[in-house]
């Protein structure tokens, strides 16, 4: 599913159903109608009159109504307000409660990925920096904050990413490679991505 609605702007959600029900043999009209109700989408208003958030919800309703096992989504919550984003994430969580279903999505909103993803991958300029189980990644990494002049207490092989500001530094480290004397803090997916990306930029 792309990050923009692909439906002609003169169509209504009801028209969308009429077209797609002929294209998909597994189309579930009742499920589509239920999703329109859940998303508070007016069935008779043309697409051109819908907000960006409503268009995204319409695209998601159409994608789910033909009962797929795999959803591929590009920035599904991009540009949406927090309430609309939570609504999209709730639907995706409901979808993946069935263990035969999966969602593959790309997003720059890392807090969304942290909420719903089991596995995460980071691509930077075509290079795969990591592909890991999310919980294992956040548990195996940590952040050390210290004066920049004290960076040499960190074993070189333990440092995965680094950010300096001239006085202090933040280092993304492998927790199991730290000496006992070094205090490390729990980290988040967002910190991991930011520190790894910063480190890669400085190496280029």
Indicate where each model-derived feature is located.
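ABC transporter nucleotide-binding domains
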Residues: 1-111, 115-124, 129-130
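Short, surface-exposed beta-strand/loop "edge" segments at domain boundaries and coil↔beta transitions
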Residues: 71-76, 150-154, 177-181
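Short, surface-exposed beta-edge/turn micro-motifs
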Residues: 59, 140-141, 168
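Short secondary-structure boundary/capping segments
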Residues: 39, 94, 134-136, 161-163
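Short loop/turn segments at beta->alpha junctions
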Residues: 12, 133, 185-188
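C-terminal coupling/interaction segments
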Residues: 160-204
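Conserved beta-strand-loop-alpha-helix hinge in the C-terminal portion
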Residues: 127-150, 155
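Alpha-helix N-cap/helix-start and coil->helix boundary motif
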Residues: 14, 110, 151, 189-190
């Amino acid at each position: 599913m792309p990050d923009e609605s692909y439906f002609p702007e003169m169509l209504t959600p009801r028209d969308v159903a009429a077209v797609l029900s002929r294209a998909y043999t597994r189309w579930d009209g009742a499920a589509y109608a239920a999703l329109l109700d859940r998303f508070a989408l007016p069935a008779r208003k043309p697409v051109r009159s819908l907000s960006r958030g409503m268009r995204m919800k319409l695209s998601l309703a159409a994608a789910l109504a033909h009962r797929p096992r795999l959803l591929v989504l590009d920035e599904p919550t991009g540009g949406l307000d927090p309430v609309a984003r939570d609504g999209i994430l709730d639907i995706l969580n409901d979808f993946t409660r069935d263990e035969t279903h999966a969602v593959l999505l790309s997003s720059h909103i890392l807090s969304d990925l942290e909420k719903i993803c089991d596995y995460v991958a980071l691509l930077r300029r075509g290079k795969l920096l990591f592909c890991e189980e999310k919980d294992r990644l956040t548990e195996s990494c940590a952040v050390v904050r210290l004066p920049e002049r004290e960076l040499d207490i960190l074993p070189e092989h333990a440092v995965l990413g680094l950010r300096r500001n001239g006085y202090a530094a933040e280092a993304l480290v492998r927790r199991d490679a730290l000496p006992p004397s070094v205090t490390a803090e729990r980290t988040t997916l967002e910190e991991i991505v930011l520190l790894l990306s910063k480190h890669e930029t400085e190496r280029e």
